[in-house]
């Protein structure tokens, strides 16, 4: 048996900001420098990715876009946004480690009955 979980970062009034899918998109933007390429890599539309980027920029800041087309434009994440992603990933990893311990306990109980 497994214990599963999902985590996300939300505003104080409960609006989701960043979860697993958002982190994947932002990591792809960081590595490619392209919203279009990142959207393709994570199987979302360019429109969805662009709207998500605008939302993140409005709530957290830290995204710099340069217009210019092929070879001249690009998108970069700030150090602040890199830190937010790092905090999210650290929390996710710690929770996974804790849940593994509880899975072992659960499996001990369920297989020894």
Predicted segment positions?
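Short, Lys/Arg-enriched N-terminal segment that forms or immediately precedes the first helix
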Residues: 1-14
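Short helix-boundary/capping micro-motifs
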Residues: 32-39
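Central "turn" residue of the DNA-binding helix-turn-helix
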Residues: 43-44
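Short helix-coil-helix linker/hinge
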Residues: 16-20
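Helix-turn-helix/homeodomain-like alpha-helical modules used for DNA recognition
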Residues: 84-113
């Amino acid at each position: 048996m497994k214990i599963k979980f999902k985590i996300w970062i939300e505003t104080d009034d409960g609006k989701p900001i960043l979860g697993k899918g958002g982190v994947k998109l932002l990591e792809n933007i960081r590595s490619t420098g392209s919203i279009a390429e990142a959207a393709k890599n994570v199987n979302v539309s360019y429109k969805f990715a662009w709207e998500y980027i605008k939302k993140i920029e409005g709530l957290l800041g830290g995204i710099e876009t340069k217009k210019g087309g092929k070879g001249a434009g690009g998108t970069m994440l700030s150090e602040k946004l890199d830190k937010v992603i790092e905090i999210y990933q650290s929390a996710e990893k710690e929770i996974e480690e804790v849940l593994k311990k509880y899975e072992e306990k659960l499996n001990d109980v369920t297989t020894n009955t």
